[in-house]
Amino acid sequence: MSERDAGFIAAVEEAQKGSNEGGVPIGAALVSADGKILGRGHNMRLQKDSATLHAEISALENAGRLPAAAYRGATMYTTLSPCDMCTGACVMYGVKRVVIGENKTFVGGEEYLKQRGIEVVVLENEKCKELMKKFIEEKPGDWNEDIGED
């Protein structure tokens, strides 16, 4: 797993799209075991006034209704460590691996993923860190809301 994987590139593109829209710059892509991008998306909470439309949920939604077997063996690429909600979605659908762009800004459910037998890979990507740093500096209140803090 590396920064050159098509799934990670798609996730970063989605994060940039979210940033360009004025939203939380987090992107994700769900990739099948054979390397096909099943779905990709970005955090749309601000753009759609949504309580739940985080990047991973957006990627799952954009993948559409799939048979359970499609998720097994799949990899979720995400630009930031997944929150508890997105961690739960990965566990529920039986995703095999979660590849994280960075986890310095926020550490979500990585340990829980590991406990549930899901491989976790952290890339510490500078672009992901820069996008989050800029967003948090410009919109600290929106960031705190996104992660459920006051």
Could you describe each region identified by the protein language model?
Residues 21-25:
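Short, flexible loop/turn motifs enriched in small residues
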Residues 9, 32-33, 48, 129:
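Non-catalytic interface/targeting segments
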Residues 69-81:
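Immediate flanking context of iron-sulfur cluster ligation sites
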Residues 1-18, 82, 88-150:
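Zinc-dependent deaminase
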Residues 44-57:
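A short, polar/charged loop-to-alpha-helix boundary motif
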Residues 26-35:
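Short beta-strand scaffold segments in enzyme catalytic cores
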